Structure formats: structure tokens, C-alpha cells
């Protein structure tokens, strides 16, 4: 069996096609893969575990059913960093620190959402350090939901405006920071999302060694992919539901 890694699904009540694709994937893959890793921004927005909106309930219930047979690991993204203990309990998922070093099928992988690598975006990194402080997160979680919704809308609008004003390279992973991480975790392969620029990169580190980095695809019309990991390494998963047949031997369509 293989391990499946996804990120940047950005699921919401406004993405019924993606929600359905994810639910079908969970149903088909349960018990058929070693583990599922979700490396952040699974949800377009997460305002707290107490949000009673009907949309996330279907995803949480499906994750819980899936987790009874297959481990699920979830990392916070910049959109859903308020995922908390109640979400973990109700979904059956294990929340991961960012970054997290794991060993899968005999190989070491350094997993991250990816926003920490974008160090050229100084304004965003300053905001991230501020908003991720534990006392600020506690305060956010205890604000009235209606106020959190207004704050969330404002932050998303500010994010869209900021992206339009920034050069593309600023919002990409810094090669220098990538190299620093890979040196610190020698012998590992880095896997991350966030940048929405899927690809496979080889880096020559300052000590002369070679290292690999895989960038996960975001989900968008015509693109609902991820990465498979097995004993032979990392493989693109352009259509994980269809790919299950290859990696498990089971027909899914």
C-alpha cells in the first residue's frame, strides 16, 4: 500500500464539486492506503471548531469514518490555522506541527504547509508570527462567531489585495530557506504546498549534497491532485481517486 499526501483543497460551501470529489476519495481509499496526510488549507476558511455551519460537518463525519480504518494526519494552513482539539477529536485526525519529519516506506520526509518557506514575503511572515501567538489564537476562538466571520472576510480581502500588489517571486518558497531546512534535516525530502506551484525540484546544498523538494498541487478546476509515497519514493497523483487502482489494485470507477 501507499501513503497519500494532499494540500490546498480549499474546501467550502461554494466548492460542491471538490467537496464531492474529496468525499468519494475518502470512501474509496478507506482501508486501502497506509495513511492520509493533509498539509494545510484543507478548508478555505476555518473560524473555529464551534462553527455550526452544515458544510464542514459532512467533511468531518467522512474523515471520522475514514480514520476508523486509516490514519489521518492534518497540518494547519494559513487559511485553517484555527483547527483545534475538537476538530481533531470529531474527525479522528492527528494534528501535526509544522514542519514535521516522518519516515514513510523507509525514506525520511520533511512535511510542511509551506508558508514558513516564503521568507521573502516579510509582511506576511510578520502577520503570521502575530496571528499564531497562542494568546491571540485563544482570543480569536473565544470571540463571538459573527465577529470572527467579519474578521475572516476582512483578512481574506486584504490577502487578495496584497497578492495583487506583490511580485510573484515574493510569494514563492525562498531557495535560501529551503536549503537551510534541507541542511538541518539532512537526508530528507521536503514536501509542501501553499504556493500553488506544483513541481519537483532538485537542490544543490551549500555542503555540496543533493536534495529533493516536491510542491503539492492545489485543487482547482481540472486539477485535484496530490502525491503518492511508496517504497520506490514519491510519485505525482494527478487524480488520486483513479490512481487508487494502480496503488492498491482495486477498481474505483
From Swiss-Prot:
> Taxonomically, which superkingdom?
Bacteria
Q: Where are the transmembrane segments?
A: none
User: Is Zinc tagged as a keyword?
Assistant: no
Q: Where in the cell is it found?
A: Cell inner membrane
Pathway in which this enzyme or protein is active: Glycolipid biosynthesis; lipid IV(A) biosynthesis; lipid IV(A) from (3R)-3-hydroxytetradecanoyl-[acyl-carrier-protein] and UDP-N-acetyl-alpha-D-glucosamine: step 4/6
MF term (GO), any: UDP-2,3-diacylglucosamine hydrolase activity
Q: Chief localization class?
A: membrane
Q: Which reaction does it catalyse?
A: UDP-2-N,3-O-bis[(3R)-3-hydroxytetradecanoyl]-alpha-D-glucosamine + H2O = 2-N,3-O-bis[(3R)-3-hydroxytetradecanoyl]-alpha-D-glucosaminyl 1-phosphate + UMP + 2 H(+)
**Keywords tagged on the record:** Cell inner membrane, Cell membrane, Hydrolase, Lipid A biosynthesis, Lipid biosynthesis, Lipid metabolism, Manganese, Membrane, Metal-binding
What is one Gene Ontology biological process annotated in the Swiss-Prot or TrEMBL record?
lipid A biosynthetic process
| GO cellular component: a single term | cytoplasm
Q: What class of enzyme is it?
A: hydrolase
Residues given in the record as Mn(2+) 2 binding sites = 41, 78, 113, 194
Query: How are cofactors bound according to the entry's free-text note?
Result: Binds 2 Mn(2+) ions per subunit in a binuclear metal center.
Q: Where does substrate bind?
A: 78-79, 121, 159, 163, 166, 194
What EC number(s) has UniProt assigned to this enzyme?
3.6.1.54
Summarize where Mn(2+) 1 binds, as residue positions: 8, 10, 41, 196
* Topology class, membrane: Peripheral membrane protein
What cofactor is needed? Mn(2+)
Q: Which family does it belong to?
A: Belongs to the LpxH family.
Q: What job does the chain carry out?
A: Hydrolyzes the pyrophosphate bond of UDP-2,3-diacylglucosamine to yield 2,3-diacylglucosamine 1-phosphate (lipid X) and UMP by catalyzing the attack of water at the alpha-P atom. Involved in the biosynthesis of lipid A, a phosphorylated glycolipid that anchors the lipopolysaccharide to the outer membrane of the cell.
HAMAP family the record matches? LpxH (MF_00575)
Q: Which NCBIfam families match?
A: lipid_A_lpxH, PRK05340.1
Q: What is this protein's record name?
A: UDP-2,3-diacylglucosamine hydrolase
Its source organism is Laribacter hongkongensis (strain HLHK9)
What is the taxonomic lineage of the source species? Answer: Bacteria, Pseudomonadati, Pseudomonadota, Betaproteobacteria, Neisseriales
Name of the encoding gene: lpxH
